Every structure is written in structure tokens, then in C-alpha cells.
Amino acid sequence: MGVRLGTFLDDQEELGPVICRNMQKEKSISFSTNTPNASRHMEYYSLSKSKSNRHMEPFFINIAPAPANEYEMSSHEGEEFIIVANGEIEINYGNETYVLKKGDSIYYDSIVPHHVHAYNNQTASILAVVYVPA
């Protein structure tokens, strides 16, 4: 669509720093792929929705297990950084597959088709920072 993900989450804009307290996080959005009957397996919590003129989109994301037939690769301009906070995730990136555990991280060009999902039918949580060029 050519629009950064955070555009749909913006509220009031702040010119200075934005602080997001752990206990005050609000679920911003939850979704999965466009696959018919897909479950909503990813809950996004925006960590910067009121920051004006931002180019990075930091999110805390809870990932529930989802059936493999719901995995649909996506791509967009920019870069992504992910660190696993809890559990394990699997990332399909191009023709490669990576399994990351708590404390592991990955940084990649998001123009390459990719999909992030919980691994081994367990829940997981990640911190993801998405950069989309202006």
C-alpha cells in the first residue's frame, strides 16, 4: 500500500521523546495473513504511536501458534530488526528458514519475502522494529 504500518495506529503526535510504560501498553492491532479463515495470531502493541515524523516502528508482538497452511510470505520496502523476548520463533526468509530462541535476534531487508511465526506450536513474544524509508 505504500504506507507505513504505524499510520493506522497514530493518535496524538508528540514532538519530544515518547515513553511507553510496560503496564500502560494498549493493543494496537491484531491480524494474520489474508488467507481465508486465518486466525488472528499476532497481537501488536505500538511503542511509538504518538511520535511525530518517525521512520522506525517499534512493536511488542505476542504471537500465538497458527497452522502452517496460514503462513503467507510478505515483502515491503525497508528493514526489520527482531529480538525474541519469550519462546521461540521461526522465520521464513526467501528460501531460508531460521529458528530463534529467547535472546536471539535477526536483522534483515524486508523486500525479501518473509514470514514470522511461533515455533513448535508454542506462544512467543518479540520486540520488532520496522524501518520503512520515507
Tell me the role of every PLM-derived stretch:
Residues 12, 77, 96, 112, ...:
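A generic "binding-loop/recognition-motif" signal
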Residues 14-27:
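Long, charged amphipathic helices and adjacent flexible linkers at domain junctions
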Residues 24-34, 40-50, 57-76, 110-113:
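Conserved short histidine dyad/triad with adjacent acidic residue
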Residues 1-7, 12-13:
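DNA major-groove recognition helix of helix-turn-helix/homeodomain DNA-binding modules
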Residues 40-43, 101-102, 110-134:
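Ligand-binding loop in jelly-roll beta-barrel domains
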Residues 71-72, 80, 96:
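Short, conserved secondary-structure segments in the cores of folded domains
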